[in-house]
Curated annotation (Swiss-Prot):
Cofactor(s) for this UniProt protein: Mn(2+)
Protein name as it appears in the record: 2-isopropylmalate synthase
Top-tier EC class: transferase
Basic and acidic residues biased stretches: 1-16
Function: Catalyzes the condensation of the acetyl group of acetyl-CoA with 3-methyl-2-oxobutanoate (2-ketoisovalerate) to form 3-carboxy-3-hydroxy-4-methylpentanoate (2-isopropylmalate).
Location, primary (coarse class): cytoplasm
Annotated metabolic or biological route of this protein: Amino-acid biosynthesis; L-leucine biosynthesis; L-leucine from 3-methyl-2-oxobutanoate: step 1/4
GO MF term (any one): 2-isopropylmalate synthase activity
Assembly and oligomerization: Homodimer.
Key words, A-Z: Amino-acid biosynthesis, Branched-chain amino acid biosynthesis, Cytoplasm, Leucine biosynthesis, Manganese, Metal-binding, Transferase
EC number: 2.3.3.13
SS bonds (residue pairs): none
């Protein structure tokens, strides 16, 4: 069994420090509910002394979490900060005070203006002071990534002896290389007495784009808590992305000797929730949760994925709550991808015709970055409009109005010359016409989409109706019809879709 790696989420504290990403208490509670749904181990709910809003957030999230997660309030190594955090956490069942100070030469000389000895004294004092309120005290050695290793070990030794239960080793500026950061954690494990009895946490930033690699290097060398945020939100270039470390541990748990209890199927939902609340858009190519994370546009890749998802996807989209793989059609797409998408839209062509269809597709793709469904439908419209009519709509007559029950009478001929005249009522003239058509045809499709657009100008414009129906096997079939009368257009489109459905069924049966 691999080690349990605790996920410490700081979206509501460090993540909120992203410019423009601030959240009010109600929004923080919504995010906290999602974190609890994901089974995150620790939630850093805020910095209580910084504002009344942060104080209330820590208080409310402490109540909300119950026994399901540790709730953390951040402080400086200052008594009044710790007092305020303890007050905010008084309702939490599993409270933790997170206190500390800088330990790098830059922080000691330029920010704190204290000596190493004074730093050690403050570290001991803040831990002891926090222990008066709670048993669970986490100490952060800010900017540990640039600290002298010997001095860092001295500080960590001192706070463990003072009663710290968690020691947080941040690379606050994202400065370190992964191997060097891992060696730093290993040095602590080798040289600090009693460190095996506390939790070693890593808090890494993304200034050089290596936050996830740094965090995993820490885990490889003894850390058992990762501090991270949804979507990698945070100061400057952000923090370690929760979704990235969780999935890395899922994929490489044996190598890293670690696993998490996070419900990975909630990752995409969490990403979208935080993006919506903060207004911080997720880049399309963001690992795990980006819009393009499971999108394929290269023809070679598309062909491979269509044959077997595992050829180019190491993660099943369902495992992170994503809708599924997506084939992006462009000039780089091949025959397989085009045929697959056309099939999904309800279009099929024999081999003898498909090369012509593909060449027309390339002409369109050369003019556009991405070819959408509407482009494909327009592309095949001329060919498919002339589809052999199994049923032909001869006429439609409707009666409707404020005082009338909508009624449609359709006249349809079939492929063997039979004539059918049927009348039906409905909730409107189009519904009545569709019910009448259903009584005539031999198959039935459920209407999924109905769209109308004018394809010419003026009050006598021709209206084009596009419908999509779903057959019993789940396949989509598209139909189009145009006329100056929108009810006639609608009926034509429906019959067109029905004809396509029947043709495809017959083709499968070899008829």
């Amino acid at each position: 069994m691999t080690r349990k790696i605790d996920i410490f989420d700081t979206t509501l504290r460090d993540g909120e420090q992203s410019p423009g990403a601030s959240m009010n208490t109600e929004e923080k509670l919504i995010v906290a509910q999602q974190l609890l749904r994901m089974h995150v181990d620790v939630i850093e709910a805020g910095f209580p002394i910084s504002s009344p809003g942060d104080f209330r957030s820590v208080q409310e999230i402490g109540r909300l979490a119950g026994d399901d997660a540790v709730v953390v309030g951040l402080t400086r190594a200052v008594d009044k900060d710790i007092d305020r955090a303890a007050e905010a956490l008084s309702c939490a069942k599993r409270p933790r005070i997170h206190t500390g100070l800088g330990v790098s030469p830059q922080h000691l000389a330029d920010k704190l203006r204290i000596s190493e000895d004074e730093c050690v004294e403050r570290a001991i004092r803040c831990v002891r002071y926090a222990k008066r309120y709670v048993e669970d005290v986490q100490f952060y050695a800010e900017d540990a990534g640039r600290a002298d290793q010997g001095f860092l070990e001295r500080v960590i030794q001192a706070v463990i002896e003072a009663g710290a239960t968690v020691v947080n080793i941040p690379d606050t500026t994202g400065y370190q290389m992964p191997a060097a950061f891992g060696a730093r954690i290993k040095g602590l494990c080798d040289n600090v007495r009693g460190i095996e009895n506390v939790t070693i946490a890593v808090h890494t930033h993304n200034d050089l784009g290596m936050a996830t690699a740094l965090a995993l290097a820490g885990v490889e060398n003894g850390a058992t808590q990762i501090e991270c945020t949804i979507n990698g939100l945070g100061e400057r270039a952000g923090n370690t992305a929760l979704e990235e470390v969780v999935m890395a541990l899922r994929m490489h748990g044996d190598e890293l000797d670690g696993h998490t209890d996070v419900v990975t199927q909630e990752l995409t939902r969490a990403s979208r929730l935080v993006s919506r609340i903060t207004g911080m858009q997720v880049q399309a190519n963001k690992a795990i949760v980006g819009a393009n994370a499971f999108a394929h546009s290269s023809g070679i890749h598309q062909d491979g994925v269509l044959k077997s998802r595992g050829t180019y996807e190491i993660i099943d989209p369902a495992d992170v709550g994503a809708a599924g793989s997506e084939i992006i059609l462009s000039a780089r797409s091949g025959h397989a991808a085009l045929r697959h998408r056309l099939s999904e839209l309800g279009y099929s062509f024999p081999e003898s015709e498909f090369d012509d269809v593909y060449q027309r597709f390339l002409e369109i793709a050369d003019q556009k970055k991405e070819v959408f469904d509407e482009d494909l439908e327009s592309m095949v419209q001329e060919r498919q409009r002339d589809v052999t009519a199994i049923y032909a709509l001869e006429s439609v007559q409707v009666v409707c109005g404020d005082a009338a029950i909508p009624t449609a009478t359709v006249h349809i001929t079939d492929e063997v010359g039979g004539e059918h005249v049927v009348a039906c009522t409905g909730t409107g003239p189009v519904d009545a016409a569709y019910k009448a058509i259903d009584k005539v045809v031999s198959v039935h499709g459920d209407l999924q989409e109905f769209a109308v657009k004018a394809i010419t100008r003026g009050i006598d414009a021709i209206g084009e109706v596009t419908v999509r129906i779903v057959a019993g096997d789940g396949r989509l079939y598209t139909g189009r019809g145009s006329d100056t009368d929108i009810v006639v257009s609608s009926a034509k489109a429906y019959v067109n879709a029905i004809n396509r459905m029947i043709q495809t069924t017959r083709s499968k049966q070899g008829k």
